Design a protein with these regions (language model features):
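Catalytic PLP-binding core of fold-type I/II PLP enzymes
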Residues: 151-183
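PLP-dependent aminotransferase-class I/II
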Residues: 99-146, 151-158
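Conserved PLP-anchoring active-site segment centered on the Schiff-base-forming lysine
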Residues: 71-89, 118
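Conserved N-terminal alpha-helix of the aminotransferase class I/II PLP-enzyme fold
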Residues: 13-61, 83-84, 88, 94
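Conserved C-terminal alpha-helix-loop-beta "cap" of PLP-dependent enzymes
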Residues: 74-76, 268, 272-341
Length: 341
């Protein structure tokens, strides 16, 4: 069965897995105080050109989103996100479970507009009863977005400017950051991203690691006492070395960026095949997620040979599905899918 339904169906990149094997018998202290975690943090600071950056490692994207947002907010605050943002529609209420409301504004192919953000905050404070409502305390965006689209440098800078004006932090979800940075249309570098937000995370789970996300506080200091706060969310690994070793490997010799390029190259090949077969795209995306409108009978036929992700109902006879590539996708996989299509 061909795997095109997501970018986390495989295990770890061989180099990451080898690093885990090579360090397996080393006794190391727990909870992220080991030498590999410290080395990984230093490599990430260097890659971000952020010598004063601080960071923590978390086990997965939901844990990263829920924990970081909780760290950023006071009990009476919520996080502003596009209505199509991951925390608004695909986190099963994890943010709300932690006591914070997701405050949604319009989304356009997965992205929010700075003007809508400014207007939302302005209207909030114009309300004479605002003390009786949930305060906008942080802003959440993702790179790439839930729809595989990208913020341009200018778009992200405009959102960041609103956040600075309003003195609220901007949090960038980078679960698929390797694939965003590798896209031809991306005009943001990793060091620039570190300058355009207050906190972001570098995705590992979808980008070559068995698990793990690296949270980077770049425009602000890490909140006080992160360890107990992470632990309260059930997101602290006793064997913190697990994430440290993996990110040490990912940020050695440019592996993280190589992983991104591999997924984008196969996504481009996939896009060509889908265009050649005459399928209609739900929207055009430059990253590793491709969204296509399939006749329901075609979806059923393809699923006999390949895993593809249901996205949403288009009409009575068509469905929007997601085809996804990853670091593990090969040209042979694309050729095999082309034969199925």
């Amino acid at each position: 069965m061909l795997a095109f339904n997501n970018d986390y169906s495989h295990g770890a990149h061989p180099a990451v897995l080898q690093a885990l094997v090579d360090t397996n018998m080393e006794p190391q202290p727990g909870y992220g105080t080991d030498a590999h975690t410290e080395r990984a943090k230093q490599l990430i600071r260097e890659a971000c050109q952020a010598p004063d950056g601080d960071g923590v490692f978390l086990v997965g994207g939901t844990q990263a989103n829920a924990t970081v947002i909780d760290m950023l907010l006071a009990p009476y605050e919520g996080v502003v996100a596009a209505e199509t943002g991951h925390v608004a529609c695909h986190e099963a209420g994890a943010i709300e479970f932690g006591g914070h409301k997701v405050l949604t504004i319009p989304g356009y192919e997965g992205k929010m507009h700075a003007e809508d953000l400014e207007n939302y905050i302005q209207v909030f404070y114009e309300n004479e009863s605002y003390e009786h409502t949930v305060f906008p305390g942080a802003v959440y965006v993702s790179l790439s977005t839930e729809y595989g689209t990208l913020y341009s440098k200018a778009e992200l800078a405009a959102i960041h400017a609103v956040c600075q004006k309003r003195e609220i932090p901007l949090f960038v979800d980078g679960a698929r950051l390797a694939y965003a940075l590798a896209a031809d249309e991306c005009d943001i570098t990793l060091p620039e991203l570190a300058q355009l937000c207050d906190v972001f995370y570098i995705g590992g789970t979808k980008c070559g690691a068995l698990c793990g996300e690296a949270v980077v506080f770049c425009g602000m200091h890490a909140p006080a006492h992160p360890i107990p706060r992470i632990k309260q969310h059930g997101a602290l690994l006793a064997k913190g070395r697990l994430t440290g070793v993996q990110f040490e490997a990912l940020f050695t010799d440019g592996l993280y960026f190589e992983i991104g390029r591999q997924a984008i190259e196969t996504a481009q090949a996939l896009r060509r095949v889908l265009h050649e077969r005459g399928y209609q795209f739900f929207l055009e995306t430059p990253t590793n997620q491709q969204f296509v409108i399939l006749p329901n009978e075609d979806m059923a036929r393809i699923r006999e040979h390949a895993s593809i992700e249901y996205w949403e109902k288009y009409d009575e006879t068509h469905t929007v599905v997601r085809f996804c590539t990853s670091w593990a996708t090969t040209q042979e996989d694309i050729d095999a899918l082309a034969a199925v299509l």
